[in-house]
Amino acid sequence: MKISVIILTFNEEQNIKKCLESLHQISDDIVIIDSYSEDKTIEICKENNCRIYSNKFINHALQMNWGLKNIEF
């Protein structure tokens, strides 16, 4: 069974690497929905082979629903 993980991010440069290292132990498909970070969040995610999408943040529920609707799993 393939497990996909969705992570919502915004300026998570300080935390995302450790999070991704943990998740790679359980999933090869990590999807990032970023809210136009201004730090190195995207670069770190690219280095860790994540699929990256950007969407304007309104709230957590809408951001997650946007991902579920627009991303192919």
Task: Give names to the regions the model predicted.
Residues 3, 50-51:
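Short, conserved active-site loop motifs that form the nucleotide-linked donor/cofactor pocket
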Residues 1-25:
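N-proximal low-complexity "stem/linker" segments adjacent to membrane-targeting elements
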Residues 46, 62-73:
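Active-site nucleotide-sugar/metal-binding loop of Leloir-type enzymes
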Residues 17, 39-48:
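Acidic helix N-cap motif at the loop->helix transition within catalytic regions
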Residues 26, 48-49:
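Short, structured coil segments at secondary-structure junctions
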Residues 22, 34-42:
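A conserved acidic beta->alpha catalytic loop
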Residues 53-61:
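Short, acidic/glycine-rich phosphate-metal binding loop used to engage nucleotide
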